[in-house]
């Protein structure tokens, strides 16, 4: 796995600032987290690449994550931002740090980052955030404290999952799909039917969604080829909906609208993930489906009641 190490000694950190507004009472820890974020954002704004990445304040995994992201897109930060701090199972988190992904289309360039920290305040992960409105809807629709923590975990999982496509991180994607995962991908096909009037030799144009079934290894092999063909990949998730299985409380269904942008291809469709949290430290995707939302003319061809959900799959244990 290639890894870039970056230096920020030539970047002027005073051009921008970052602060944590609330959510943490330990002032020394708060200050450390703020300094670590500012150092990282300075690196984003530096065009220089060297062997002198952040020497402290960041984990090795986070270095790899950021390096892979920067290999595929240029990230620029130019704001003064204040974010709340959220306590998580594994440490702390700040959300909504605004950046521009300069390789993306203009309309999609403006994004926000989610930054995770260890209990000691070191940066442990960076991912591209889901929309603030979507996050609030997900976290407000909870039934218990356990459900809140699980939803928090699911949001982090979904954001890391999305960012893995932007990073072209095949090892991560290989690790989150179950070896027995079911992959279903839809595509729009055109066909013609003859008029019911026997006296008329008229054929009418129709469209339907045709589905292709793959296993994990077939899907990842195809994805690897897509990554190689495209200089950049930018995946955006919208309208995220999370549903807990009525019988198995460690199974969740996640439905979302996915917008895919890359060097040579773009599309829009609905993604469904059935995620198994029976091992909470290593959640696995058991089912992944993708259905096109519109045809080439921009007409909607997928109706709401045709979108895959938990009820479409039978779980055997």
Describe each PLM feature range.
Residues 11-48, 122-163, 167, 175:
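Short, low-complexity N-terminal intrinsically disordered segments enriched in polar/charged residues
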Residues 1-15:
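Bacterial Sec-dependent N-terminal signal peptides
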Residues 25-33, 82-97, 181, 186-188:
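Short, charged N-terminal helix-start/capping segments
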Residues 31-70, 168-196:
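Short, well-ordered alpha-helical segments enriched in acidic and aromatic residues
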Residues 104-150, 247-255, 261-317:
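Short beta-strand edge/turn micro-motifs at domain boundaries
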Residues 131-212, 216-240, 244-249:
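Acidic, serine/threonine- and glycine-rich low-complexity intrinsically disordered segments
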Residues 17-20, 33, 37, 51, ...:
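Generic preference for hydrophobic/aromatic residues in regular secondary structure cores
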Residues 14-15, 22, 58-116, 197-267:
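Surface-exposed, charged secondary-structure patches
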